[in-house]
């Protein structure tokens, strides 16, 4: 099977780290071992600096980051990662497993922030072209459950400190996008861990069975 780009998405506390390990184990059981791991924003020297700027609550002092400036920083980090890490890895025949990609921007900025969705789609197409993940695994969790888990991890970043309404809008947009795109598979991440693990493994296995040899 040719190399593929698989992305794990979801609200804070959805369980993306655990899901990544389950994806890796499922791929390994199918004989796939050459993998590259990415996160967004981040994954390159430049992208990690942008990550600090956009997520660190102290990064800009008293200066509030404008919503459109935030979008552009996310895309700057994303383009750098795609062009210098993800595309070269895929060209080498490696599989890429990503913690977030463009769906996050469409959900968080388009849903949570309420930024014009046509503008976001136009910007995405301008900088990414037709580049898309082969599969996106969306871990659906309510904001109440997700934020409770996130708080248990420790100090929240700038995005994680947004209001419950922000995360409700973000989740609604995630669900809307997932319903419209067959390359996005949804897993109920509010279930007990063993049930989530079972569903993730089954989803990956089913998707792999659908792919050409």
Curated annotation (Swiss-Prot):
Organism: Klebsiella pneumoniae (strain 342)
PROSITE patterns registered for this protein in UniProt: THYMIDYLATE_KINASE
Residues holding ATP: 10-17
Protein name: Thymidylate kinase
CDD domains the UniProt entry points to: TMPK (cd01672)
Gene Ontology MF terms in the entry: ATP binding; dTMP kinase activity
Function comment: Phosphorylation of dTMP to form dTDP in both de novo and salvage pathways of dTTP synthesis.
Spans traversing the lipid bilayer: none
Claim: Nucleotidyltransferase is one of the keywords in the record: no
Top-level taxon of origin: Bacteria
HAMAP family registered for this protein in UniProt: Thymidylate_kinase
Keyword Kinase: yes
Catalytic activity: dTMP + ATP = dTDP + ADP
Family statement: Belongs to the thymidylate kinase family.
GO cellular component terms, A-Z: cytosol
Any GO BP: dTTP biosynthetic process
Keywords: ATP-binding, Kinase, Nucleotide biosynthesis, Nucleotide-binding, Transferase
Enzyme Commission no: 2.7.4.9
InterPro entries reported in the protein's UniProt record: P-loop_NTPase, Thymidylate_kin-like_dom, Thymidylate_kin_CS, Thymidylate_kinase
């Amino acid at each position: 099977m040719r190399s593929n780009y698989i992305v794990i998405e979801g609200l804070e506390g959805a369980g993306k780290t655990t899901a990544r390990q389950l994806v890796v184990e499922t791929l390994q059981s199918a004989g796939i071992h050459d993998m590259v791991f990415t996160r967004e924003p981040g994954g390159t020297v430049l992208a990690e600096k942008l990550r600090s700027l956009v997520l660190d609550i102290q990064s800009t002092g008293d200066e509030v980051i404008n919503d459109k400036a935030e979008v552009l920083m996310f895309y700057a980090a994303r383009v750098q990662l795609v062009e210098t890490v993800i595309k070269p890895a895929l060209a080498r025949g490696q599989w890429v497993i990503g913690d977030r990609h463009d769906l996050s921007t469409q959900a968080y900025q388009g849903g949570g922030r309420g930024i014009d969705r046509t503008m976001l789609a136009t910007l995405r197409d301008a900088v990414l072209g037709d580049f898309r993940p082969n599969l996106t695994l969306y871990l659906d969790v309510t904001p109440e459950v997700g934020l409770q888990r996130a708080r248990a991890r420790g100090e929240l970043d700038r995005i994680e400190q947004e209001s419950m309404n922000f995360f409700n809008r973000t989740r609604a947009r995630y669900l809307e996008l997932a319903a419209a795109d067959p390359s996005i598979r949804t897993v109920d991440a509010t279930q007990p861990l063993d049930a989530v693990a079972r569903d993730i493994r089954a989803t990956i296995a089913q998707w792999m069975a659908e792919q050409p040899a």
